[in-house]
UniProtKB/Swiss-Prot annotation:
All-trans-retinol binds at residues 41, 109. Forms a beta-barrel structure that accommodates hydrophobic ligands in its interior. GO terms for cellular component: cytosol; nucleus. GO terms for molecular function: fatty acid binding; lipid binding; retinal binding; retinol binding. Intracellular transport of retinol. Belongs to the calycin superfamily. Fatty-acid binding protein (FABP) family. InterPro entries: Calycin, Fatty_acid-bd, ILBP, Lipocln_cytosolic_FA-bd_dom. Keywords: Cytoplasm, Retinol-binding, Transport, Vitamin A. Its main location: cytoplasm. It comes from the Eukaryota. It is found in: Cytoplasm. This is Retinol-binding protein 2. The gene is Rbp2.
Length: 134
């Protein structure tokens, strides 16, 4: 595993995305559209500074952060909530905690070989996404 997450990553699999979205109270119609989409992630990393773009034909979401620095995040590309977000390193894995009205919310992201792994959590729901480097 490596800490380097730079690159363009295309989605290969998206397990339990609907369950994750239900836990976020995302409406039925949006969930039905979103589960059929393929996402592309573009990550520009300079040490602990990240600029990320998640693109699909339905919605795009940009997130810029510095590891270890808490910030206010508006999750407009997903459920439209305001959360306090902190991303840290655990070994070579980025671990994000999002504090707000939903319990146990956040994500983990790491690279192994030419694959980017992302686990999204809300409540008791975990979505597992795998991306391949383009």
């Amino acid at each position: 595993m490596t800490k380097d997450q730079n690159g363009t990553w295309e989605m290969e699999s998206n397990e339990n995305f609907e369950g994750y979205m239900k836990a976020l109270d995302i409406d039925f119609a949006t969930r039905k559209i979103a589960v059929r989409l393929t996402q592309t992630k573009i990550i520009v990393q300079d040490g602990d500074n990240f600029k990320t773009k998640t693109n699909s034909t339905f919605r795009n979401y940009d997130l810029d952060f510095t590891v270890g620095v808490e910030f206010d995040e508006h999750t407009k590309g997903l459920d439209g909530r305001n959360v306090k977000t902190l991303v840290t390193w655990e070994g070579n894995t980025l671990v994000c905690v999002q504090k707000g009205e939903k319990e146990n919310r956040g994500w983990k992201q790491w690279v192994e070989g030419d694959k980017l792994y992302l686990e999204l959590t809300c409540g008791d729901q975990v979505c597992r996404q795998v991306f391949k480097k383009k």
